[in-house]
Amino acid sequence: MKKIILIAYALTCTASLYAGHSKELKLTSPEGVHEVMFRQEKISSSVNEIVYQVKYRGREVIGNSRAGLQLDNRTWELALARKINQVKCWMDNLEVDSVIYQPAVNKSWHPLYGERSTVREAYNEAIMYLSKKDGSNYRLNIEVRAYDEGIAFRYFFPEHP
């Protein structure tokens, strides 16, 4: 019996060690209405991209779609004399460093005016940490929230070292 408990404990510890090192972010709303997934996908031998997908009640409503930003850093990088290989989309070749799942949120707040005196705010949240491995040290976080009413995500650029 002690052996079984010890093995179960070891497996739990091992799983928790690798939980933050997944290359995929998969999040479901509190009631399971919406599901969103972000992952890294290799599209050629030299290019990978971040794609996302959204499901509503188990049905796919947004198929694999490319997450992207149109940024033109060439002038800045030339001024800094950086030798960086330019890619078609700024988000190409971002590598997933880790995915961190935040504790579920379930709280209420009171608006100053409106139809309701109390508004419930319930969601699950995760953050995907990405970085460029081309010598630029650029980083990007994708912060994702899954509400029962819908999905929200934003791009966050941490301060550049």
PLM segments and residue spans:
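N-terminal accessory beta-strand-rich subdomains and adjacent acidic, glycine-rich linkers
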Residues: 24-161
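Boundary at the C-terminal end of the N-terminal hydrophobic targeting segment
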Residues: 17-22
